[in-house]
A protein has these predicted regions:
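N-terminal Lys/Arg-rich, disordered targeting/topogenic segments
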Residues: 1-9
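Hydrophobic membrane-insertion alpha-helices, especially the h-region
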Residues: 11-30
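C-terminal partner/receptor-binding element of secreted or periplasmic proteins
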Residues: 130-187
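Acidic/histidine-rich, surface-exposed loop or edge segments in extracytoplasmic proteins
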Residues: 43-58
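Ser/Thr/Pro/Gly-rich low-complexity linker/stalk segments immediately outside membranes or between
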Residues: 29-45
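Mature extracytoplasmic domains of secretory-pathway proteins
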Residues: 56-143
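Short linear motifs at secondary-structure transitions and domain/linker junctions
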Residues: 24-31, 75-81
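Generic detector of low-complexity/intrinsically disordered segments
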Residues: 16-19, 122, 164
Length: 187
């Protein structure tokens, strides 16, 4: 007895089913997360300063990999949108990212928009050589100490480090900071 061919409706149904699975599998493959860097999120961004959150279990070598990826993006095409950073100089379409400063934290409270604004306000006060209140000075120190790493990009030059935010009043050699790369200051 010869085999009976599939009914056209069954054939269409199987084609739709297999096509759907193929589309879903292809979409999942194409939209998979980048596993070469640790998971991260942009907690907040104020102008050129970006607070990045990584999970608490992220190791220093993983954070170094993330910082080096930012360096690679800055060196290759100067467009940090692929790294979830909004343009820092949106008024200039030729150079959307003239300067980017990243601070990496494990504790999400330090990446909140209000916390970053408060830190930047204390930084502006300190830069103006005005006296900070005891509370604000303590907050500033704690914010800087809580950072796990940082990255600075300025017109194609970069600096990356592991450790707290460097205190400009103390030489970096005396701080608990590991400089990964630094070409901000020409040799």
């Amino acid at each position: 007895m010869p085999k009976k061919p599939f009914d056209p409706v069954v054939r269409i149904g199987l084609t739709v089913l297999l096509g759907g699975f193929t589309l879903i599998a292809g979409g999942m493959f194409l939209s998979r997360p980048d596993r070469t860097i640790p998971p991260f999120s942009i907690g907040s961004q104020e102008g050129t300063v970006v607070a990045v959150h990584v999970p608490a279990w992220t190791s220093d070598p993983d954070i170094e990999t993330l910082i080096r990826r930012f360096q690679k993006v800055g060196a290759s095409h100067h467009d940090f949108r692929s790294m979830k950073v909004r343009p820092t100089t949106p008024d200039d379409p030729a150079t959307l990212y003239r300067e980017v400063i990243l601070y990496v934290f494990s504790d999400p409270q330090w990446t909140e928009p209000e916390t970053l604004r408060r830190y930047l306000a204390t930084q502006a006060t300190a830069d103006a050589r005005q006296q900070l209140s005891v509370e604000e000075a303590a907050f500033r120190r704690e914010f800087q100490r809580s950072a796990r790493a940082g990255f600075t990009y300025s017109l194609g030059r970069t600096k990356g480090w592991l450790g707290p935010i460097p205190d400009p009043s103390t030489p970096e050699q005396r701080q608990n900071i590991q400089i990964l790369f630094d070409d901000l200051v020409p040799s």
